[in-house]
């Protein structure tokens, strides 16, 4: 039983840095590709008046629901936003980051 608990603890400890790395990667990707218009962090205003702050996206819809759109290509209803399509590994990192910054 002690070995099982030790192994479970080791798995959790090994997963934590990967999760933190995903969050950081997601932040980097969004800052690079979206930060010109959207507020990407926990504070600040979006530079474009119609671009929602990413920390408030969870108020509109579940963050997980963005997974398909991020992987297949995000298209907006307004012409100022270019289409973005992310690789599968990047989508997971972006979702992890977005979840980490949502405000209640």
State what each model feature region is.
Residues 3, 20, 27, 87-88:
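Short, structured coil/loop segments at alpha-helix boundaries
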Residues 21-50, 72-79, 101-104:
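Periplasmic/extracellular electron-transfer cofactor-ligation site
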Residues 1-9:
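Bacterial N-terminal signal peptides that target proteins for export
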Residues 15-17:
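N-terminal signal peptide c-region/cleavage motif recognized by signal peptidases
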Residues 53-99:
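Extracytoplasmic electron-transfer domains, predominantly the class I c-type cytochrome c fold
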């Amino acid at each position: 039983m002690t070995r099982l608990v030790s192994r479970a603890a080791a798995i959790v400890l090994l997963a934590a840095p990967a999760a933190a790395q995903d969050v950081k990667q997601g932040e980097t990707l969004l800052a690079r590709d979206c930060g010109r218009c959207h507020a990407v962090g926990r504070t600040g205003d979006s530079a474009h008046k119609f671009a929602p702050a990413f920390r408030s996206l969870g108020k509109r819809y579940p963050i997980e629901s963005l997974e398909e759109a991020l992987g297949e290509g995000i298209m907006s209803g307004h012409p100022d936003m270019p289409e973005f399509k992310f690789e599968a590994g990047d989508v997971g990192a972006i979702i992890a980051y977005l979840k980490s910054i949502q405000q209640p």
